[in-house]
Amino acid sequence: ARGAKVIVVSSPSKQQTLLSLGADVVLNRNMDLLAELGENSVDVVIDLVAGEQWPTLLQLLKPKGRYGVSGAIGGALVELDVRTLYLKDLSFFGCTHLDEGVFARLVSLIEARAIRPVVAKVFDLQDIHQAQITFLEKLHTGKIVLRVP
């Protein structure tokens, strides 16, 4: 995390795994994050979910904070009071486009075992239905991989 304090919002069942992977704090996704962390308490939010917690995440951001998003499994449409954006001078960015060379660097780090992707389960392509069921149960930590023959 390059010196950053990493706060993860997840289900309680994943807490120990996330702590073992380097999270400093794991908070229950159903708790009142604003009461727990306080307004203007974080510099950066990386959101993979969006949905109903979205407005709270913006309240957590400090002025000049950065909000990055790379998923919307909690709901693709969110409402923004644009005053929050301009009064706090927030920056929003997507996290799906990689600059040239990033993927090759990532692969080289994996090959050198400097970083390790977390794989929850591997399914053969023919078992894609079971893979989807496993994904929807939300009990896994890490990626669900489909093995293509």
PLM segments and residue spans:
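Well-formed, non-transmembrane alpha-helical positions, independent of function
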Residues: T17, E36, T56, T84, ...
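A general structural signal for well-ordered alpha-helical segments in protein cores
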Residues: V42, W54, V82, F103-V107, ...
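Adenosine-nucleotide cofactor-binding segment
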Residues: A1-W54
